[in-house]
Curated annotation (Swiss-Prot):
GO terms for molecular function: FAD binding; oxidoreductase activity. SUPFAM superfamilies: FAD-linked reductases, C-terminal domain, FAD/NAD(P)-binding domain. Keywords: Electron transport, FAD, Flavoprotein, Oxidoreductase, Transport. The keyword Oxidoreductase applies. This is Protein FixC. Belongs to the ETF-QO/FixC family. It comes from Escherichia coli (strain K12).
Length: 428
């Protein structure tokens, strides 16, 4: 293998890496994907929601054959205190186009399927091998060193996940700071398909996506999530790494208390724990973006920090897919001119500007806005308090709605309400 020179070596068989391999192989490029896990997706952890638009135009109708779990039609956003919750519920009963849909997925299944599509197109995959170093010649990346073997390529695409050591060694990425990432933990809880559908009011392959703010992370930056799969639930939480030193609870204890919350416990009652996983999640958006392009090298997916936590929804997989496609298109263009210089590969950033970077730039101030203790303590308590007063009738004299809101608003502080409101308008 060391005698071959590939058009591209891709480090990592996640979504970005697999899509890059697929798009390249379809055009006849010689592609090698190196995955340190025993299979594609073996090392990947996600809450579990894939927005279909970025993959739909690469593999039209992919959901008909891919191992997607459920079509998300129900959205829930809950503000939680220790014992109560105020939930907003949206049900989409309208017919949507394939590119407007989203699905719950299990990465171990989905990533393996996607990599199979790339292999069928001609890409090569080796697993269980770690890339230790990138090979450079005259300042240009010309291959990788893996398991003591040097494998050469005209380009290398780094899709090796958040905190890419290889990108750091190249000087293209800085060491990840605690403020840039969060710790995510997830349990996969097995329940009968019919039970899931009854509890979440689903029909057929419909699914629900639920996000929770407040008590799941003990009032710290982050939140809980729950996604319905075919016969399992993906339940977990994410907490900003830089806040953990202030935490009164460990992350496992946060998760256990979240599971016992009155709004959550009935949903998972009787379920069987079949999997536990933990992962570091990029949270800083475009503010943690590395240098995306070098001589002979590109960075994509989580390795490039391509994740967006908007509070009401979380995006990462669709951005990774778009980045993988953009990287592949850039390499194909470079192959035509036999120019793999940094200047030529800069086309990659141009492709990204019409997708991931455009979206990430729009919300670049959001991470700092959300890194506000009131967002995960004061405001959930405000929402729950107003809801409690609204629905409580005890025979005492009635109180106007505005007075209920003002009374609870005092706890947050009216100056804080005004400041946060004005800042929210500029950010969102």
């Amino acid at each position: 293998m060391s005698e071959d020179i590939f058009d591209a070596i891709i480090v990592g068989a996640g979504l970005a890496g697999s899509v890059a391999a697929l798009v390249l192989a379809r055009e006849g490029a010689q592609v090698l994907v190196i995955e340190r896990g025993n299979s594609a997706g073996a090392k990947n952890v996600t809450g579990g929601r894939l927005y279909a638009h970025s993959l739909e135009h690469i593999i039209p109708g992919f959901a008909d054959s891919a191992p997607v779990e459920r079509l998300i039609t129900h959205e829930k956003l809950a503000f939680m205190t220790e014992k109560s919750a105020m939930t907003m519920d949206y049900c989409n009963g309208d017919e949507t186009s394939p590119s407007q849909r989203s699905y719950s997925v299990l990465r171990s299944k989905f990533d393996a399927w996607l990599m199979e599509q790339a292999e069928e197109a001609g890409a090569q995959l080796i697993t269980g091998i770690r890339v230790d170093n990138l090979v450079q010649r005259d300042g240009k990346v010309v291959g990788v060193e893996a398991d003591g073997d040097v494998i050469e390529a005209k380009t290398v695409i780094l899709a090796d996940g958040v905190n890419s050591i290889l990108a750091e060694k190249l000087g293209m990425a800085k060491r990840v700071k605690p403020t840039d990432v969060a710790v995510g933990v997830k349990e996969l809880i097995e329940l009968p398909k019919s039970v899931i559908e009854d509890r979440f009011q689903l029909q057929g392959n419909q699914g629900a996506a639920c996000l929770f703010a407040g008590s799941p992370t003990d009032g710290l930056m982050g939140g809980g999530f729950l996604y319905t799969n075919e016969n399992t639930l993906s339940l977990g939480l994410v907490c900003g790494l830089h806040h953990l030193h202030d935490a009164k609870k460990s992350v496992p204890q946060m998760l256990e208390d979240f599971k016992q919350h009155p709004a959550v416990a009935p949903l998972i009652a009787g379920g069987k724990l079949v999997e536990y996983s933990a992962h570091v999640v990029p949270e800083a958006g475009i503010n943690m973006l590395p240098e995306l392009v070098g001589d002979g090298v590109l960075i994509a997916g989580d390795a490039a920090g391509m994740c967006m936590n908007l509070g009401f929804t979380i995006r990462g997989m669709d951005l990774a897919i778009a980045a993988g496609e953009a990287a592949a298109k850039t390499v194909l263009s470079a192959m035509k001119s036999d120019d793999f210089s940094k200047q030529k590969l800069a086309e990659y950033r141009q492709h990204l500007e019409s997708g991931p970077l455009r979206d990430m730039r729009m919300y670049q101030k959001l991470p700092a806005f959300l890194d506000n203790p009131r967002m995960f303590s004061g405001y959930p308590e405000l929402a729950v308090g107003v809801a409690r007063d609204l629905f409580t009738i005890d025979g005492s004299a009635p109180e106007l709605m505005r007075k209920k809101i003002l009374r609870h608003g005092k706890k947050v502080g009216f100056i804080n309400l005004i400041k946060d409101g004005m800042k929210g308008v500029t950010v969102l």
